[in-house]
Amino acid sequence: MKKFISVLLALILICGSAFTAGVYAQEDKSEICFAVASDVHYVTPAKTATSTPYNEGVETTFKSGKDSLYNQSGFIIDEFLDQCAKNPECRFVLITGDIATHGRDFASEHEAVAAKFRKFEQETGKQVYVINGNHDSALNCAVGREDFISIYHEFGYDKAVSVDENTCSYSVNLNDEYTLVALDTCDERYRVVPNNDLSRMNWAVTQIRNAKREGRKVIMIMHHNLLEHNPYQKALEKNYVVDTPYSFAGLLADLGVKLVFSGHTHVTSATSYTSFLGNTIYDFSMPSLGNFPAEYKLFKMTDSEIKYETKKIEHIDADKLAEVCKGYSKKDIALMKNDFQQYTWNRSHAVYSEKIRKDISPETIGIKESSALYGKLKLVTDGLRELSDTPIYGENGIQTMAAAYGLEIPNSSYSTLNEALTTAYLTYKSGRRIYSQDSDDFKLIVKLIAFSIRKSAAEAADGDVLFDANAFLRELGYSGTVADNILKEFSKKYGFATPEEKAALSLAFALFGGFCSDTDGVENRDGSIPGYGVKEAAQNRFAAAFEKILIKIIEIIKKFYPIFNQFFEKSI
């Protein structure tokens, strides 16, 4: 029996040494440094500052929002490339899609950007590599797959080891050590990521395996996120994350891919996933270069460590912009020349503030008019819009009014609900702050919504505006169990008991909850992760699960064969 026990223990130790070998690093090779940008969104400038391409006769299949930096986009690209040119460490540039806002409709926009890339390469000798996004090409549009590849042939395709015959995907050797696999994640309709497109995945896997056989490390670029970057992103934000993200990510991780760069969301975020075998892959969702926050990332890699830093577009050539596009005020020109980050914040804050002021409705949250919840929810969202710009504090503020309804509104630095929501959204997009579920910001928003519900109930003809919180969350895409767990978890933290507060909690989660659970430990803006030469501990799941199974076997043997207990006790 002791021999049997020894065998069991040996198995555990063997698995422990095989799967929990810890972390070791190979000898560092030379550092490689490169820049990554996404969602450049170039647009041909309008004739005047107050105009847009659309009211100047441009007809397109896709319009961007009012916060888009239409007229500034070309000058932002110039400044970005200038920074890369002046950085002696930066060896190449990666662009992860949405290069031109109207790219699938006007080849001229792509050609303008390609000319800038070409000039950069000729002057610096540094290579640019691109992949398409949903704005860049589409079936039955002016710019399709072959057109995109033709325009950008110099930027990855000409030197490619392989180009997928059905998509814009390609693989190319960056140097003697690294291979880039650029994966087209757009389908022919341009908006939806591949629906279980096995041929596309198989092509990528083949490229990775070929690179590995040659002793190369693989990094990847794609437009849509490989992983979910906030809770239930795939359920709530359609067409933002690749299909079957975790099975695909696990496969890539086990093939040795550690770095993936994506975009599309315009959100500065980084997250990771560890496969069943214990291999970790990182998905860096890039900020938008051509919209708020007008930023990109710089990566420095050695075998032992990968460091990354978010870089800002601090200024553009606003004098040249004013020559092309008339009507900018002296104040705006000065701000674009000296503090472009503040200019983009001001512009986006104004746009999103107005959007929140006008657009809080059941439809924008995701509830259709045909829903049984629609009527009650509309009374609440109408009330929120009315309260949007009401001062929270002061003699006639919401805090005072809420007290009359038995609700305590906590103190904060925000002046209005609109300011709280707008600031939270933009801060989240830039990755500058991670909001927790315990944050004062979230508590404040829940309480303000609870007041709106209670006030709406008091003013409604029948006094019935309450909607079922679980039904609401389920209709947004959460499962019944998940909906229950969300409410239980939040209710425990805040001590919510009233039906109004639970309804408010579910609505606050729909508006704000996606900002509140970035707990993966990967820094969004600046940080470091283990390099490709580091083998991270692979015990995570396999060895832990195996050890649990062996312990269970021992427990069963001890239970049904008590005579063997003494052997286990002496041996363990």
Where are these regions (language model features)?
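Beta-strand-turn-beta hairpins that frame and shape the catalytic cleft
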Residues: Q26-A35, T44-A49, T167-A182, R213, ...
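Non-catalytic terminal accessory segments
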Residues: K2, Q26-K29, A318-I572
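Divalent metal-coordination and catalytic microenvironments
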Residues: D39, V93, D98, V113, ...
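Extended active-site neighborhood of metal-dependent phosphoesterases/phosphodiesterases
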Residues: S108-W203, R209, L277-S285, L298, ...
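His/acidic metal-ligating clusters that form di-metal
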Residues: C84-F92, Q122, T179-V181, R191-Y282, ...
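N-terminal active-site segment of His-dependent metallophosphoesterases
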Residues: Q26-A107
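Active-site environment of divalent metal-dependent phosphoester hydrolases
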Residues: V43-A46, T101-R104, N132-C141, E188-R191, ...
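Sec-dependent signal peptide cleavage junction
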Residues: C15-D28
